[in-house]
Amino acid sequence: MINKSIIRNDFKTLETSLKNRNSKLDISSLKDLDKKQSELLLIIESCNKKRNEISKSIGIYIGKKDNKKVDELKKEMESIKNTLETTNEELKTISAKVDDILLSIPNIPDSSVPIGKSEDENVEIKKWGTPTKFDFNHKAHWDLITDLDIGDFERATKVTGSRFFIYKGLGSKLMRALQMLTLDINTSNGYLEMSLPVIVNSASLTSTGQLPKFKEDLFALENSDYYLSPTLEVQLTNYYRNEILEESALPMKFTASSLNFRSEAGSAGKDTRGIIRQHQFYKTELVNLVHPEKSYQALEEMTLNAESILEALELPYRRILLCTGDMGFSSSKTYDIEVWLPSYNSYKEISSCSNCLDFQARRSMIRFKNSKTNKNELVHTLNGSSLALDRLFAAVVENYQNKDGSITIPKALVKYMGIDSIKKTK
């Protein structure tokens, strides 16, 4: 959530931010609502002050046995009580309208973020490795998976439905190896490994920005306040919701690997083949809670951490700085990491690393006690995929395929797999 002070002090910046993000959100009423909210709060404050004064006066006049004056003051007290009830009710209505708008306003992009309308205006920052070339007719990962019998699309559709997949045999072992590699690299870089519930409540989703705006993307559990988590960012960020941390404990760095669930609303027709876009998918996640002065340094470090996994696997990738029109709702600055996928003959997103500044922390009230000011301040939160594991699986299978239809196991995974290749079984 944005800082409310911007409504009064720099409304133009807010309007510009929404324009640059291609947002159609109407905030024209926000200034008047905020002003009315402030006026009502002043009335309530004045009434409470007056009520306290009258209460003291009543005690004095009771002591003087001036019943007439006591009755007059009690009538005045009753009038104030009625005013407070009416004003509080009006404030409740106004505050709800203000909160509805504030919860729908995306984070303000950092000044270093390029202004643009779509992914076409994202900026390439770096490339690593050379796109894989083959001297034979290479196959897409969905064909390799079927040929090597390491997964099953048809039976997953039978068991559940479209956009689901079953890993099996060496395919399941390869997925487990990718989870272990990503977690091992993350923990070696100071991240604390967590194992978390895959079900979260609405308060957690509101804190990280999925609710209320993106409810249609979620799988809700019927007749409850529970949802299947769309990303481990939700659980890891909310771990310290409504808590005050010691400054000396920062930064806090968490990692976890688990299943995630998204309805993929609005994605009809996109990546319909293979395991690139599914309703249920594996992901290893990074979340940082940091001192506000160090969040942009943390973003660079987090991105390098995610990239190091691709380098360990010797997979070509590039880093992209997202423009204002392509950024996530809660982010102030985002790098996408894209891995080379031969079946697409292009790079495909495998990670997003974002600095959310205090946007999520304000929603979730995660604070730290500043040792210099002795005041409680909001932490900055960051999150990043390290990595999207189904896409990483596809990248390994495609980039390491051989002419005979086998797959060479990347050196970094051999110790987890115990084999150096996956071959067709006769």
UniProtKB/Swiss-Prot annotation:
GO terms classed as biological process: selenocysteine biosynthetic process; seryl-tRNA aminoacylation
InterPro entries: aa-tRNA-synt_IIb, aa-tRNA-synth_II, aa-tRNA-synth_II/BPL/LPL, Ser-tRNA-ligase_type_1, Ser-tRNA-synth_1_N, SerRS_1_N_sf, SerRS_core, tRNA-bd_arm
Protein localization: Cytoplasm
Pathway involvement of the protein, from the record: Aminoacyl-tRNA biosynthesis; selenocysteinyl-tRNA(Sec) biosynthesis; L-seryl-tRNA(Sec) from L-serine and tRNA(Sec): step 1/1
Residues involved in ATP binding: R262, S263, E264, E349, I350, S351, S352
EC number(s) on file: 6.1.1.11
EC class (word): ligase
Subunit structure: Homodimer. The tRNA molecule binds across the dimer.
Protein's job: Catalyzes the attachment of serine to tRNA(Ser). Is also able to aminoacylate tRNA(Sec) with serine, to form the misacylated tRNA L-seryl-tRNA(Sec), which will be further converted into selenocysteinyl-tRNA(Sec).
Protein family according to the UniProt entry: Belongs to the class-II aminoacyl-tRNA synthetase family. Type-1 seryl-tRNA synthetase subfamily.
Name of protein: Serine--tRNA ligase
Gene: serS
